[in-house]
Design a protein with these regions (language model features):
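Nucleotide-sugar donor-binding catalytic core of glycosyltransferases
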Residues: 1-110, 116, 148-162, 166
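Residues at or immediately preceding the N-termini of alpha-helices
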Residues: 58, 120-123, 132-135, 152
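Catalytic phosphate/metal-binding cores of nucleic-acid and nucleotide-processing enzymes, i.e., regions
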Residues: 62, 95, 120-123, 142
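Short amphipathic alpha-helical surface patches that serve as generic macromolecular interface elements
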Residues: 81, 111, 120-124, 139
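Conserved acidic donor-binding segment of nucleotide-sugar-dependent glycosyltransferases
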Residues: 113-120, 129-130
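Alpha-helical elements of Rossmann-like donor-binding domains used by nucleotide-donor carbohydrate transfer enzymes
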Residues: 122-126, 141, 154-162
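Conserved donor-nucleotide binding/catalytic region of nucleotide-linked donor-dependent transferases
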Residues: 125-145
Length: 166
């Protein structure tokens, strides 16, 4: 896990950095108020033109995410998003919300790779039950899953495995 931050080095408990660019995203992301329960929550809304510019470069975005323990996953234009893969690869434990599709060839397992909440009201209690040791275990599970499924070598090996099983 070279280059990944330890528990102590992560200064952000929970994060969501995303935006709303169309009515579908607005409907999926703005129904509930997640900003009160996520420590660093940024979701500028611009439906139509001009589209809001990203506040952060890709490197700045990934640096902020890498400083986080947990990352909120909200559905966007569709049920799948790159955000989950970014979180898993950086060892950030995803917080899945209703409408997020987390089905993969190798299934993610609740309370092993991610936590699930149905509403903002559940977030604090769920996060408070995860101590340093449990978070480290979950974070390592996330990184291992990413390496097996999404890293260049892992995704190649997985593709070969799937083809061989056809």
């Amino acid at each position: 896990n070279k280059g990944l931050k330890s528990y102590k080095e992560r200064k952000i408990k929970s994060i969501f950095l995303g935006k709303v660019e169309n009515p579908v995203q607005f409907n999926n992301r703005a129904k509930l108020n997640w900003s009160d329960v996520i420590d660093l929550f940024e979701m500028p809304i611009s439906q139509g033109y001009p589209v809001a510019k990203y506040k952060y470069t890709q490197d700045e975005y990934l640096e902020l995410v890498s400083q986080s323990l947990f990352g909120l996953c909200l559905p966007g234009y569709g049920p799948k998003c790159n955000r989950e893969i970014e979180l898993l690869g950086l060892g950030v434990v995803p917080i899945f919300t209703p409408g997020v599709d987390n089905t993969y060839y190798e299934p993610l397992i609740e309370n092993k790779h991610y936590i699930k909440v149905n509403s903002p009201e559940e977030v604090k209690n769920k996060l408070d039950t995860i101590n340093k040791n449990k978070w480290e275990e979950m974070s390592n599970n996330c990184i291992s899953w990413y390496n097996r499924n999404c890293s260049p070598k892992g995704s190649f090996d997985l593709t070969i495995k799937i083809i061989n099983n056809i």
